[in-house]
A protein has these predicted regions:
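An N-terminal assembly and electron-transfer interface module characteristic of large anaerobic redox
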Residues: 1-176
Length: 176
């Protein structure tokens, strides 16, 4: 089984909205919140969300290096084959958090990781040339199931170290 860890913010984890943006990094066993939908698609491909790491947007961005270090520390015990950062949809601050964490995991820790967010997220332009970002709809937009399927497919491919196809084939934002 492919071991997946997902990174979510307080909203996607179901812990509250903007009033909970100060939540510090914490782990959860298995899938939570938005991850419950994604887990179904991953399981069809021989993968499962073994853990979720959560951090509030405000806390992450105000303490970026500390948050990245703590989240990395929390991810290690799950022995992840791949880390999915998001989906952030069009939550601007969360998109940036996803980009920073995916970049650190890939470059510093050599853990396969990628992000998922809508084109409207500020994280998309900041990170599209630095990490793979699977395109998702914005909140309330159509196509969430299709994007979750692309996320699951990409996670499996990334975990196996398989060659990554074009942005059109894989569903990530084109890199310059």
């Amino acid at each position: 089984m492919i071991r997946v860890v997902q990174f979510l913010n307080q909203i996607q984890a179901g812990l509250g909205g903007d009033e909970r943006m100060d939540i510090e990094s914490r782990p959860e066993q298995g899938a939570v919140g938005m991850g419950m939908l994604l887990r179904t698609m991953l399981m069809r491909k021989g993968a499962d969300i073994v853990g979720t790491v959560i951090c509030g947007d405000h806390y992450f961005l105000e303490n970026r290096e500390e948050a990245v270090a703590k989240l990395t520390e929390l991810i290690r015990p799950f022995r992840a084959d791949v880390v999915i950062c998001g989906p952030a949809l069009n939550h601007k601050r969360f998109g940036e958090c996803c980009g920073y964490l995916a970049e650190a995991l890939e470059n510093r820790e050599k853990i396969p990781a990628f992000a998922a967010m809508a084109k409207e997220s500020t994280g998309t332009e900041l990170f599209r040339n630095r990490v793979y970002i699977i395109e998702t709809p914005k909140v309330g937009g159509t196509g969430l199931n299709a994007s979750l399927k692309r996320i699951a497919d990409f996670a499996v491919k990334k975990s196996k170290g398989e060659p990554i196809g074009s942005s059109e084939e894989e569903g990530y934002f084109k890199r310059d």
